């Protein structure tokens, strides 16, 4: 696999504060990368640099061996799609109209099958004629996810598999739809799309990601396969809380929901 996306000592500073400090990553085509870390660790800032929305103060970000900021807006939009954590829509568009926006200026006739497939994928086919403001927050998030799937599909027809960036995509979703969304992202990765997602649920990250990137205070704390990253010592240090990391029968790590009592620590580490 070729290096699809690369950050080289990428740093972002504003107002004298360094939000992301000298982060280097090499991401292959078709990988699913989960970015995790506590609040204020620099996750969204890093994602925006990788997307081309923010230009690094120092260092570089390259998409397919080319500086990401050198792409013209339309060309960049055809190669990467980003689902932001909060999307504000001022007008009462229908779900169908929102999803169609992912096709840009392409004709409806040329993109209708992509729109239909995306609505079906997110479970909103029966909601396509509903006004977006009448939907719940989670349903609106799913509509915007369908929009970026259409954007990816249109770009793939021109350039091949692209880049999907997700900023806390599950924050407003119930458990079932959290699993559905991340499963869809994983399926995109298996089909060649490079996926980078900020996730707060470490169990989701461990279950679906090929690699987990951990940020702490703007710096890279860890980068590797889930079973190497989701370890008691790292989780305790980065998140400043004691949680019990266990291994499932298939070798995937998972974190128990309850905090570990201090007198259980010796047994846990044994």
From Swiss-Prot:
Organism the protein comes from: Rhodopseudomonas palustris (strain BisA53)
Recorded GO CC terms: plasma membrane
Biological classification of the source: Bacteria, Pseudomonadati, Pseudomonadota, Alphaproteobacteria, Hyphomicrobiales
Keywords tagged on the record: ATP-binding, Cell inner membrane, Cell membrane, Membrane, Nucleotide-binding, Translocase, Transport
Entry binding sites for ATP: 37-44
The EC number(s) this enzyme carries: 7.6.2.-
Annotated signal sequence range: none
Function: Part of the ABC transporter complex HmuTUV involved in hemin import. Responsible for energy coupling to the transport system.
Main location: membrane
Protein name: Hemin import ATP-binding protein HmuV
GO molecular function: ATP binding; ATP hydrolysis activity
Subunit structure: The complex is composed of two ATP-binding proteins (HmuV), two transmembrane proteins (HmuU) and a solute-binding protein (HmuT).
Location in the cell: Cell inner membrane
Membrane topology: Peripheral membrane protein
Source organism, top-level taxon: Bacteria
Xref: PROSITE patterns: ABC_TRANSPORTER_2, HMUV
SUPFAM superfamilies from the UniProt entry: P-loop containing nucleoside triphosphate hydrolases
């Amino acid at each position: 696999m070729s290096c699809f996306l690369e950050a080289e000592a990428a740093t972002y500073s504003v107002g004298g504060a360094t939000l992301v400090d000298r982060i280097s990553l090499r991401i292959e085509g078709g990988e699913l990368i989960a970015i995790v870390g506590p609040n204020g660790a620099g996750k969204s800032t890093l994602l925006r640099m990788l997307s081309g929305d923010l230009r690094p103060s120092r260092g570089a970000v390259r998409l397919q061996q080319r500086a990401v900021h050198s792409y013209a807006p339309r060309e960049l939009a055809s190669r990467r799609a980003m689902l932001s954590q909060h999307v504000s829509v001022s007008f009462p568009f229908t779900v169908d109209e929102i999803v169609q926006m992912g096709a840009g200026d392409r004709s409806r006739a040329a993109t209708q099958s992509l729109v239909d497939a995306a609505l079906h994928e997110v479970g909103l086919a029966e909601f396509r004629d509903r006004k977006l403001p009448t939907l719940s927050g989670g349903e609106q998030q799913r509509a915007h996810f369908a929009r970026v799937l259409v954007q990816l599909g249109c770009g793939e027809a021109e350039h091949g598999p692209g880049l999907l960036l997700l900023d806390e995509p599950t924050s407003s979703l119930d458990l079932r739809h959290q699993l559905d969304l991340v499963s869809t992202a994983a399926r995109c990765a298996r089909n060649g799309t490079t996926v980078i997602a900020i996730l707060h649920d470490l169990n989701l990250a461990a279950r679906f990601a090929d690699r987990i990137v951990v940020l702490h205070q703007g710096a890279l704390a860890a980068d590797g396969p889930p079973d190497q990253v989701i370890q008691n010592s790292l989780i305790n240090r980065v998140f400043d809380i004691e949680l019990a990391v266990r291994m499932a029968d298939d070798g995937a790590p998972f974190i128990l929901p309850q905090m570990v009592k201090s007198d259980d620590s010796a047994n846990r580490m044994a």
